Amino acid sequence: MEGVPSVRDSLVRARILVRGVVQGVFFRASMREEALRLGLSGWVRNLPDGESVEAVVEGRGDAVERIICWCLRGPPAARVRELRVELEPYKGEFRGFEIRY
């Protein structure tokens, strides 16, 4: 609809869970690089199960959509089996994008 802002133009926050062969394949470093390229802030970390990566990203809706699409494939050695995304209220709490341990 004309005159109605879309989610793509809004500031949004998403919690992303990726499962599969996503640890030990440079997923976190590659995601950080992609997030910074897209102007997103937040963090990414491995989960202790050995097969999952969790991330929280904030930024423009179109950039968040792009990082979600990127997560479907990940870096070349990754094999994504499952992707879950939860939208959360934007908080603006991050400066930059970090890898958490």
Swiss-Prot record:
The active site is at residues 28, 46. Pfam families: Acylphosphatase. GO terms for molecular function: acylphosphatase activity. It catalyses: an acyl phosphate + H2O = a carboxylate + phosphate + H(+). SUPFAM superfamilies: Acylphosphatase/BLUF domain-like. Keywords: Hydrolase. Residues 13-101 form the Acylphosphatase-like domain. Its EC number is 3.6.1.7. It is an enzyme of class 3 (hydrolase). Disulfide bonds: none annotated. Belongs to the acylphosphatase family. This is Acylphosphatase. It comes from Aeropyrum pernix (strain ATCC 700893 / DSM 11879 / JCM 9820 / NBRC 100138 / K1). The gene is acyP.
